[in-house]
Each structure stands twice: as structure tokens, then as C-alpha cells.
Amino acid sequence: MDTTALRSAYEKLFTAAAGTDLGEAGDGGWNADQILAHVLSVDAAIAAVALGVVSGSRPSFDNRISLDAWNLDRIVADHSGRADLIGHVRSQATILCDIADHLSGHASSVLIPAILLSNDALVLDQPIPLAGLIDGLAEDHVPVHTQQLLDLRAAVREHS
């Protein structure tokens, strides 16, 4: 697989996350650390799915654990601060991209039973090719969370 777009999307996320002017979500949504923890959780799960396919098993993907507040807080607490968390997300993103770079055409076309929720709504409940799961990170998931981080900057400016 070609991960150029995904790597580029991550770089934009890391630039946004490194800002020192990130406030709280005005709508009670996730703060910057929770957004990063969510991305880390999703990336680790998709990397595990990809490695499972390579090993010959047929894993599934369910993003509900990456939406769980307790799990996100656990991930945040495991880090010494935002820089440490960003470093871990960066490392996990690199691992995921490196795995994807080495997937064969056959492996990337394996259908993965998937359940995806977003904002408490079911987005997907059907098999999706592994490549589609990974490409969805670049096309939607990472840019959406990058925008969330940028919106946290705007929230600070509005309250200044």
C-alpha cells in the first residue's frame, strides 16, 4: 500500500497537536489529550488487525474501545505529558504506516468485519477491505481529528 497520504495527514495532526494554545472543547467534547489518545487507540487496533491478516488469522475491527472515556483517560495517564503522548502517537503511526507499506495486494484486500461508531451513531457495520480501513484514516479519520485540534485553538482565541 502507498501510505504517502496517511503520513502527510499525520504530520498535519502532529503540527496541530504541538500547539501550546489548545483549550477545551466548547461543546464538552474531547480535549487535545483525549483526541490524541483516541488516535493512538485506533492506530494500535488497526495495526493489530493488519498484523493479524499477515499472520493468517481473520481479525475484526471495532472502534468502540477507542471511544470509551475510561480507556482514553487511561492512555493519557500512561504518559508524562502532551509531548510524551504526541511522541507515542507518532511512533504508533509510523508502525502502522510501515506495516501498511509492506502489505501484499492480497492481504490489503482481505475483508475485515468492522463496526465503526462516531458521535454515538453507527457509521459502518459490515466487512471492509483492510486497505479501505487504512485509507479511511488518511481520507477521514486523521483529518477530522486534526480539525478538532485546530478548533480547540479557535476556542482559546474566542475566550481571550
Give the predicted meaning of each segment:
Residues E11, E24, D68, D98-D101, ...:
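Glutamate identity and glutamate-enriched acidic tracts
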Residues E11-Q34, S55-F61, H102-Q126:
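Helix-loop segments that flank and shape redox-cofactor active sites
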Residues M1-T4, A45-I95, V156-S160:
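Short, helix-capping/interhelical loops that line the mouth of catalytic, cofactor-
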Residues M1-L6, L22-V42, L72-H88, I115-H141:
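Alpha-helical scaffold segments that form or flank carboxylate-/histidine-based iron centers
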Residues Y10-A18, D43-L51, R90-S104, T146, ...:
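Structural signal for well-ordered, non-membrane alpha-helices
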Residues D135-S160:
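A hydrophobic membrane-anchoring alpha-helix module
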